[in-house]
Amino acid sequence: MSERHLPDDQSSTIDPYLITSVRQTLAEQSAALQNLSKQLDSGQYQRVLNLIMNCKGHVILSGMGKSGHVGRKISATLASTGTPSFFIHPAEAFHGDLGMITPYDLLILISASGETDEILKLVPSLKNFGNRIIAITNNGNSTLAKNADAVLELHMANETCPNNLAPTTSTTLTMAIGDALAIAMIHQRKFMPNDFARYHPGGSLGRRLLTRVADVMQHDVPAVQLDASFKTVIQRITSGCQGMVMVEDAEGGLAGIITDGDLRRFMEKEGSLTSATAAQMMTREPLTLPEDTMIIEAEEKMQKHRVSTLLVTNKANKVTGLVRIFD
């Protein structure tokens, strides 16, 4: 097998026009979005939002080709933000998957031209089922638009593609419309971060919102007694690898903590640490977290007080562990 040589990016010569083309494409798509915002029919959008709010089934997206890819994304966004939704391929629907659709479902059909054959073939069956239809199209006079209960027009002059063929601007506008509908429904449903986390338990946000500090805390808390020497404190902080040490009273309860910062501040104030005890260096009544505190609340508290480690306590106010902001 011959060795494959990758081109050296530094030695490649790029026609400056290509960079100009990139800027022009971004500018044209940005202008198209601005134009859509200015020309949108508020009455049609209000009707669409009412249809979505009152839908007792699923909001089903369908589209062919690139429109289908965008439809999948819109459906995924709706589903993850509290609006039950799925995507159905129009060709597959016409060959049996119509059985997935109930009369309670709302259909959003995507076709820039409004004349996509596979989409139009679905319309008679959907009307026979009694489904409401929303069209996203660039042609308000198209067959699809005329058969829809509500029409969201793209108001697009041309595709960004120099040949005006590849779906570019139309897919950007359609995606933006989908996001706009999803965000509007988030406001309508008062969809909060906790709700979002329920649908994203495997993601970072879901973990932070659904996980308690007790689930992730470290149980081995480095500790010293009130009369511990400076040397002992340093040894426990170093061996504990937490940048802090808990100071225990005679009954084993929490008397305070000593952090790296406490040591520096004490040294700046006193000048010498050789004869200091833990009781002299510690911060009394340190911040703590109950075991049932959610991770996101712990992070907020740490950021507010500019600390990276907090001790965790149980209902009896006994220290049971510690949690770091990056755990």
Curated annotation (Swiss-Prot):
Residues 217-273, 282-327 form the CBS domain. Inhibited by 10 uM zinc, cadmium or mercury ions. Zn(2+) binds at residue 89. ATP binds at residues 63-68. One of its GO terms (biological process) is lipopolysaccharide biosynthetic process. It holds the Pfam family SIS. Its EC number is 5.3.1.13. This is Arabinose 5-phosphate isomerase KpsF. The lineage of its organism: Bacteria, Pseudomonadati, Pseudomonadota, Gammaproteobacteria, Enterobacterales.
